[in-house]
Amino acid sequence: MAYRDARVSHVKNGIYGSMWVAAMIAKAFETSDIKTIIKAGLSQISSSSRLFKAVSNIIETYDKGAPAETCLAVIRTCYNEEVGYDWCHTISNAEIVTAGLLYGNKDYGKSICLAVGTCFDTDCNGATIGSVLGTAIGYEAIPDYWKNRVNDTLESTLMGYSTVSISDMAKKTLDFIEKSPK
């Protein structure tokens, strides 16, 4: 489904990025092990892709014990807008998400802040980490500080759904899944 959805507006690594995130969220329902979740995402994309190699390099950097600041600084240097990359480039943002998930050590706020503080596509990176990690650790483990600010409300520009309850939308989504043919 992620492939079909992403190909409407993305190509190549943009499509792979969507597939990677969808697979991570799906795996997060089964395990809270961050590396297992990231690798499950990688298992859905081509191992010869630049995205696969970039995310794998971040895992390797983390495994070698490099500090978060060093890892994130390398990403910012390689993909700096001044060297020709756009701030919403899939590869650099996937690297930031990977680093945030790994270096955040399942601390919801720290993980999100590592990604957002690195800049680039801040809203997407924070939301991706929040989605993956929130699923992995469960709603009850998300600190109230983060939940209370949202107040179970989603504001959008989608006609008929401009202000909706997040819990109602989650229930509608679950109902849809349960009614879908297997």
Describe the predicted segments one by one.
Residues 1, 36, 144-148:
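Short sequence/structural elements of tandem HEAT/ARM alpha-solenoid repeats
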Residues 9-13, 20-21, 92, 96-172, ...:
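Catalytic phosphate/nucleotide-handling subdomain of diverse soluble enzymes
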Residues 48-87, 136-182:
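Acidic, carboxylate-rich catalytic segments that either coordinate divalent cations
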Residues 3-10, 22-119:
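Accessory "access/gating" subregions that flank catalytic or transport cores
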